[in-house]
From Swiss-Prot:
Protein name per Swiss-Prot or TrEMBL: Large ribosomal subunit protein uL6
Similarity section: Belongs to the universal ribosomal protein uL6 family.
Keyword RNA-binding: yes
Cellular component GO terms, alphabetical: cytosolic large ribosomal subunit
GO biological process terms held by the UniProt record: cytoplasmic translation
UniProt keyword annotations, A-Z: Ribonucleoprotein, Ribosomal protein, RNA-binding, rRNA-binding
GO molecular function: rRNA binding; structural constituent of ribosome
Length: 179
């Protein structure tokens, strides 16, 4: 048994889980998410509002998908109850972010400002011109949007300028030695 896959998934009050064949739908106070479980894995509702994820055999692929499927469904439940937040910060002279409606406008040292539109289910919050956050109920989408924003200007290893995750440590490099 997979260490992660064998753990039951607790369904909190206020969350409605519907299993229709291979499709799992989760509705909660923050919204709803749907996921299709891969073929060999089965999900069943147990007593006491618990979901159990099982696999039919001990083949390598079944073992790999067991823990993954359980974690994806658990992340859906966490998303519709608490949501996910990815905080980012900008460092560098003249680098800043502005909220333009539901979108973000970045000044990152290029000759033009960069406009990032919020995908469906994602919201941006700007705390100050150098700190902002990406919020949503889908963990994968929140992480992907945050990574795409970070990619606009990756942190420079020499001066540590750019967009980075809050708390991310940038390994600094020593510059060229002068004569």
């Amino acid at each position: 048994m997979s260490r992660i896959g064998k753990l039951p998934i607790a369904v909190p009050a206020g969350v409605d889980v519907t299993i229709d064949g291979r499709t799992v739908s989760v509705k909660g106070p923050k919204g709803s998410l749907t996921h299709t479980v891969v073929a060999p894995i089965d999900i069943a509702k147990g007593e006491d509002g618990v979901l159990n994820v099982t696999r039919p055999n001990d083949e390598r692929q079944s073992k790999a998908l067991h823990g993954l499927s359980r974690t994806l469904v658990a992340n859906m439940i966490t998303g519709v109850t608490q949501g996910y937040v990815k905080k980012l910060e900008i460092s560098g002279v003249g680098y800043r972010v502005l909220a333009k409606g539901s979108n973000l406008e970045f000044s990152l040292g290029y000759s033009h400002p960069i406009l990032v539109e919020a995908p469906e289910g994602i919201t941006f919050k700007v705390e100050n011109p150098t700190h902002f956050s990406v919020e949503g109920i889908d963990k994968q989408k929140v992480g992907e949007v945050a990574a795409n924003i970070r990619k606009l200007r990756k942190p420079d290893p020499y001066k540590a300028k750019g967009v980075k995750y809050e708390g991310e440590v940038i390994r600094r490099k020593v510059g060229k030695a002068g004569k």
